[in-house]
From Swiss-Prot:
InterPro entries reported for this sequence: MIP1_Leuzipper, PH-like_dom_sf, PH_domain, Rho_GAP_Regulators, Rho_GTPase_activation_prot, RhoGAP_dom
Site (Arginine finger): R244
Protein name: Rho GTPase-activating protein REN1
Residue span, Rho-GAP domain: 213-412
Tissue specificity field: Expressed in pollen and pollen tubes.
Keywords from the named record: Cell membrane, Coiled coil, Growth regulation, GTPase activation, Membrane
Chain intervals with Basic and acidic residues compositional bias: 475-491, 499-509, 520-532, 734-768, 776-788, 889-903
Gene (name only): REN1
Source organism: Arabidopsis thaliana
Coiled coil: 598-728
Membrane topology designation: Peripheral membrane protein
Length: 920
């Protein structure tokens, strides 16, 4: 009890409001009088009766300021800050400071609740948690209201102010009733009479129609209700808080009067909250309930069955007990509710919220107490029995509507219902309904105020079930406005019913069976086509009997009789201030223990709904993650395959390159071996290729040939020297020729240098020769060797002929000249072979440095072939050129000898010999 509070359990009592406005300090009172909405931000004038406790002059404001309130019992899961005003007789709270300027003209600052003070109360403070608890020993268990301050300073200030107010509060025995709250038995007829005297009651052409004409006019055109339903479906479903937030009563009445005057179409620019309240006002003013009492009993019995058979039982109940017009009207309203609930992400109205707003309008008899609800509440005689019955009835009504919404297709689908099954006996309604018709809507009746004992309770229950809704000030403050006092006719006549032995002995199982968590939930509502009302005239009347809230319970019957004489016009309500549906102050102080019975269901239900929504959200997230992971896995597999293939290709390349490197190393070794063969007899490695092996063998053969040629040259030189010695001793001219021989050798050396330069140029051009080109060169060299040998033989024969000729002519110098020519040829051949050897060495060095991996191009091969051809032709021309050079040299020698002889003949009378004789 210590942790409960008063926002819903203790509804703002009637006596708090008169005391609040008239007895506050002048500054606050003046600010409140400037508010544009009358009692929306202030307290209405004091009512007559109990003048000792409601005097206007002595009720001062001890303290006002913000405090936080919270209670698990009323569905709030966190502390909420409200503006409290403490007077001598009451502690009331508002959404915000009532003296502050309103931010929006459409928002109102109503009294959300309050408690009555008496001198029996006490204050308990928990400083560690900054909690402030007000205790009253009223009734059986007493009352306890817990508040929370922001700071320790505020905590102590509020404690002192509360203790001061309690000491000055009136005595509980003088001003309290059985429940410890002020009674408000009489209305104040003096207030607002001048404002209403000019208004003449007229019969409305829109309101008060029978159920048969609720959806369709006599001429078949859509009725006011049908147009309002379509407007909500088309334009109101995207408005936050539709059907929950209330519009001003005067605006609603003004729109209905405009409709009656000819403005019978709703434009999209109109306020959806006003049209929604017009819709609810129309249903409230129906002569009979949309669901008759007998049908409510049938639905109640069906709702008590287990979950598996509940839908079939409710379908059977509708088929057997519902009149056709009532069934069509119920279906049409449920379709609109489904449309609203299907847009819950936008309008923040889920199935529970829509059912909480519309169930009191659809199931009037159930909330009015005309249906039997099993209970075994034993709470004493303090009136808590009535409140528990009201809470149980509200829970059952909401559970029935939720089931109808969630199982709409199963209950009202194609083929589920047959018009022939309907009974016409229910259309006229019961006699009790007809007799109580005119008592349904009467603002002057005290029962309408007593009905608010459930109004604000349902507000907080709805706050709990709609935990995801915005907690903005406008939404929270306007929530209860959407519930009209007549939506929940929970009257004090329930006290007479509580005296019945039948009611007191009924089991308690119905309350636990009202848990909506046991109902199946399907948020996807489907719509049928619009329903056209057809059938016979319906003369049903309202079925709820209002009972006076007099302290004497036995006088309730006479109060009902007097109430039936009052007109059911909204304009007959006392006071000229604006009103909001569901905001007439209640007069019961519902204890926290009694609320726990009815609200515990909503707490569990909200928890289940939150868990289900969280589960669905997590499942959707898991599905998305699985899809993304599958895509990533596939990409990873493709990447692995690509890398594996790349790895294999690289391994193959590495193996091939290693083999090629080994081959090049072997070739290098073989070439080095070939270069070193001249130094010694080294074997050729077997690992080299055949072409290279042939090249090395040819080089070795060429070196052997060169060695032989050098040996022959040495022999020839020796012979030539020996022959020259003999020749010099025999003739003077031969000695002269021998003296000219060094000059001739010098010229021959110059020619050899030219030849070496040409050979060097040829070797540079042939650095890219392959094994095949080398083989061809070897063949050319062999040809050159054979030709050189033949030229040597010819030279020897020529020289021998020349020697014989010289002998015959007496000139010995010509033979020595021919020998010198042969020697020059051998020298040229030797130089060529040396150049070839240096060429091969250069090739080996280039191959070692460049790491050549491929075979030579065809172009290089062609170049080598052409170069070898040129060299071959050059070598073939060498013997001829030598032959040509030899006669030329001989001619020069003979000419010189002739000159000498000329000179000698001139000096010594020698005959002149023509050198041309031997040039041929």
């Amino acid at each position: 009890m210590a942790n409960k509070n008063a926002e819903s359990s203790s509804q703002p009592p009637p006596h708090v409001q008169p005391n609040q406005q008239q007895q506050q300090q002048p500054p606050i009172a003046n600010e409140q009088e400037q508010e544009p909405h009358g009692d929306t931000c202030s307290i209405p004038p004091a009512q007559s009766g109990n003048t000792d406790s409601r005097s206007r002059g002595g009720n001062t404001v001890f303290k006002s300021g913000p405090l936080s309130i919270s209670s698990k019992g009323i569905g709030w899961t966190s502390w909420k800050k409200r503006w409290f005003i403490l007077t001598r007789t009451s502690l009331v709270f508002f959404r915000s400071d009532p003296s502050a300027v309103q931010q929006k003209g459409s928002e109102v600052n109503l009294t959300l609740g309050g408690i009555d003070l008496n001198n029996s109360g006490s204050v308990v403070v928990k400083a560690d948690k900054k909690l402030l608890t007000v205790l009253f020993p009223d009734g059986r268990d007493g009352r306890a209201f817990t508040l929370k301050a922001d700071t320790m300073e505020d905590l102590h200030e509020w404690k002192a102010a509360l203790e001061n107010a309690l000491t000055q509060a009136p005595s509980a025995s003088h001003v309290m009733g059985q429940n410890g709250i002020f009674r408000n038995d009489h209305a104040d007829p003096a207030v607002g009479v001048d404002e209403k005297k000019d208004e003449t009651p007229t019969k409305s052409t829109v309101l008060g129609r029978p159920v048969l004409l609720a959806l369709e006019d006599v001429d078949g055109a859509p009725s006011f209700l049908e147009k309002a339903l379509r407007f909500v479906e088309n334009h109101g479903v995207r408005i936050e808080g539709i059907l929950r937030q209330a519009a001003d009563v005067d605006d609603v009445e003004h729109r209905i009067r405009e409709y009656e005057k000819g403005k019978n179409e709703f434009s999209p620019e109109e306020d959806a909250h006003i049209i929604a309240d017009c819709l609810k006002y129309f249903l409230r003013e129906l002569p009979s309930s949309p669901v008759p009492a007998s049908c409510c009993n049938a639905l109640l019995e069906a709702c008590r069955t287990d979950r598996g058979n509940r839908v079939n039982a409710m379908r059977a109940a509708i088929c057997e007990s519902f009149p056709e017009p009532n069934r069509r009207l119920l279906q049409r309203i449920l379709m609109m509710m489904q449309t609203v609930a299907s847009n819950k992400t936008v309008n923040r109205m889920n199935t529970n919220a829509v059912a909480a707003c519309m169930a009191p309008l659809l199931l009037r008899p159930l909330l009015a107490g005309d249906c039997e609800i099993e209970n075994d509440f034993d709470v004493g005689g303090d009136g808590s029995m009535q409140l528990l019955q009201a809470a149980a009835a509200a829970n059952h009504a909401q559970a029935i509507v939720i089931t109808l919404l969630e199982e709409y297709e199963s209950i009202f689908g194609e083929g589920s219902l047959s018009p022939g099954l309907y009974s016409d006996s229910e259309e006229s309604g019961s006699g009790t309904e007809e007799g109580s018709d005119d008592e349904e809507y009467d603002d002057d009746d005290d029962g309408s105020q007593g009905s608010e004992d459930y109004t604000d309770e349902e507000e907080d229950l709805e706050n709990e079930s709609n935990g995801s809704y915005s907690e903005s000030a406008a939404s929270e403050d306007k929530y209860a406005d959407s519930i009209d006092p007549d939506d929940h006719k929970i009257n004090d006549n329930l006290s007479t019913e509580s005296k019945s032995p039948k009611r007191s002995k009924e089991p308690k199982k119905l309350l636990s069976g009202s848990r909506r968590s046991s109902l199946p939930r399907h948020d996807d509502g489907k719509k049928d086509e619009d329903i056209v009302v057809k059938g016979v005239n319906n003369t049903e009347v309202k079925a709820v009997v209002e009972v006076s809230t007099s302290e004497d319970k036995n006088s309730s019957t006479s109060d009902v009789a007097s109430d039936t004489q009052k007109p059911s016009k909204l304009s007959d309500a006392p006071g000229g201030s604006k009103r909001h549906w569901g905001r007439t102050p209640g007069k019961k102080n519902l204890s926290m223990e009694s609320i726990d019975f009815s609200v515990e269901v909503d707490e569990d239900n909200a928890d289940i709904e939150r868990l289900e929504s969280t589960k669905l959200e997590l499942q959707s997230r898991i599905t998305e993650e699985v899809k993304s992971n599958a895509v990533l896995q596939a990409s990873l597999e493709r990447r692995k395959k690509a890398l594996y293939g790349r790895r294999q290709a690289l391994e193959q390349d590495v193996g091939r390159l290693q083999e090629q490197l080994q081959q090049e190393r072997d070739r290098k070794l073989a070439l080095e071996t070939g270069l070193n063969m001249s130094k010694g007899n080294q074997p050729i490695p077997e690992t080299i290729d055949e072409n290279l092996k042939k090249d090395l063998q040819e080089v070795a053969q060429a070196e052997a040939d060169i060695a032989k040629l050098e040996h022959k040259v040495d022999d020839l030189e020796n012979r030539l020297g020996h022959h020259d010695g003999k020749a010099s001793g025999s003739t003077h001219s031969a000695s002269k020729e021998s003296r000219k021989l060094p000059e001739h050798n010098a010229k021959m050396k110059e020619k050899q240098k030219d030849t070496e330069a040409a050979s060097t140029h040829i070797s540079e051009r042939s650095t890219s020769k392959d094994g095949q080109g080398a083989a061809r060169e070897n063949e050319t060299e062999k040809q050159q060797d054979s030709r050189s040998k033949s030229s040597q033989q010819e030279t020897s024969r020529g020289s021998s002929k020349l020697v014989g000729l010289s002998k015959r002519s007496g000139t010995k110098g010509e033979g020595s000249t021919t020998t010198t020519s042969a020697l020059s040829k051998l020298t040229m051949r030797l130089n060529f072979l040396k150049e070839r050897r240096s060429q091969i060495a250069n090739e080996l060095q280039n191959m070692d440095k460049g790491k050549t991996l491929g075979q030579p191009s065809p172009t290089s091969g062609q170049n080598r072939v052409s170069e070898e051809t040129e060299k071959g032709s050059g070598s073939n021309q060498d013997p001829d050129s030598s032959k040509l050079q030899s006669p030329h040299i001989l001619d020069r020698g003979r000419s010189e000898n002739g000159g000498d002889r000329g000179r000698g003949s001139s000096g010594g009378n020698h005959p002149n010999t023509t050198p041309r004789t031997f040039s041929r």
